[in-house]
């Protein structure tokens, strides 16, 4: 059975921004740590925060999906076509969650999609073209390889966050993300996690464009 929990910060009155995010992957990839990093930034800066965690069969490598809404929202679930950002730690899970991404409308760009995959051309060309025609940015990064090269395959999640942080349209600045990673990661993993974040950020800056 999938389990769903809500995260709220009802005391905050700040309304600086409205952001809707989806993080997807499979059990063991650290989807929930990524959620915690983003939530940490929102809570520390006083943004209203609401979200949902769908753990599914996460203990056995099943799908894991989290919804995060920062700003003035009532429902914790991101609707189809509502996500500003999708981070997928597993390429097949990305296909299952692409429908959440927001198309360009009313003069605003579409959502941003960051996917962990070893081959930058893995995505079906027709699907990628369809997304791009909707103004959705699709960015693929070998986060597994980066984390493995740096000696910590379990830090694939940190590598993908670092890569995404290089995009100027990403809702959190790299310095805020780095500070949040430093706060939420266990001490024994902290130094290497920060190195992986920094290295992936540099790689992202070579690749990503607004």
PLM feature segments, named:
Residues 5-14:
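Arg/Gly-rich low-complexity intrinsically disordered repeat tracts
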Residues 2, 15-210:
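Active-site cofactor/cluster-binding pocket
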């Amino acid at each position: 059975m999938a389990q769903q929990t809500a995260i709220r910060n009802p005391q905050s009155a700040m309304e600086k921004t409205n952001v809707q995010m989806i993080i997807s992957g499979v059990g063991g990839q650290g989807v929930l740590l990524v959620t915690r990093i983003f939530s940490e930034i929102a809570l520390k800066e006083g943004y209203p925060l609401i979200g949902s965690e769908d753990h599914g069969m996460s203990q056995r490598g099943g799908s894991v999906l989290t919804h995060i809404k920062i700003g003035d929202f009532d429902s914790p679930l991101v609707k189809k076509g509502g996500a500003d950002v999708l981070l997928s730690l597993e390429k097949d899970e990305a296909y299952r969650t692409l429908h959440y991404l927001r198309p360009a409308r009313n003069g605003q760009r579409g959502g941003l999609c960051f996917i962990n995959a070893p081959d930058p051309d893995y995505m079906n060309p027709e699907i990628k073209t369809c997304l791009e025609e909707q103004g959705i940015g699709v960015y693929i990064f070998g986060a597994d390889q980066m984390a493995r090269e740096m000696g910590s395959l379990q830090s694939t999640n940190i590598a993908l966050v670092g890569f995404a942080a290089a995009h100027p349209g990403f809702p959190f600045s790299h310095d805020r993300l780095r500070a949040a990673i430093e706060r939420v990661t266990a001490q024994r993993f902290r130094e290497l996690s920060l190195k992986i974040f920094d290295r992936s950020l540099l790689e992202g800056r070579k690749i990503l464009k607004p």
